[in-house]
Design a protein with these regions (language model features):
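A common structural junction motif
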Residues: 14-15, 74-82
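Small/polar-rich, solvent-exposed N-terminal microdomains that initiate assembly or binding
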Residues: 1-42, 63
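Short, conserved charged micro-motifs
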Residues: 63-70
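Residues that form or flank phosphate/diphosphate-binding pockets in enzymes
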Residues: 27, 66, 93
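Conserved short beta-strand edge segments in small beta-sheet-based binding/regulatory domains
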Residues: 20, 81-87
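Short glycine-rich, basic-tinged beta-strand/loop micro-motifs
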Residues: 48-60
Length: 106
């Protein structure tokens, strides 16, 4: 999955999707960002394929957020391996923050 495909995929889950920083903060939104290289394929002294870790952060003020079910079902429907890294309540903003990890091929 490319970075553009990740963007389009997340926009299919919610239009409140932002890359790197949310300039709006509705009650529920997603911010995604590339984190760094997790793997690569080399040949003839060149990098042929680069795999990036991509963090997807979901912020919501809902107690039992439907967006989490929608996102995880969408991951499974598209065959995208994912890992839920953490769930944290942020008392200063009143958001619950879900952090996912997926990979992108660049």
């Amino acid at each position: 999955m490319t970075l553009q495909e990740i963007k389009e995929f997340l926009l299919g889950v919610t239009l409140n999707t932002f890359h790197q920083e949310a300039w709006e903060q509705p009650d529920t939104y997603i911010v995604w960002q590339e984190d760094g290289e997790s793997d690569a394929v080399h040949g003839d002294n060149k990098k042929l394929v680069q795999i990036l870790d991509v963090t997807i952060d979901v912020y919501t003020k809902e107690e039992y957020p439907e967006i989490i079910t929608r996102l995880q079902n969408a991951f499974n429907d598209k065959g995208i391996p994912f890992e839920l890294l953490s769930i944290q309540y942020e008392s200063d903003t009143k958001y619950t923050h879900y952090e996912y990890l997926i990979q992108a091929v660049v």
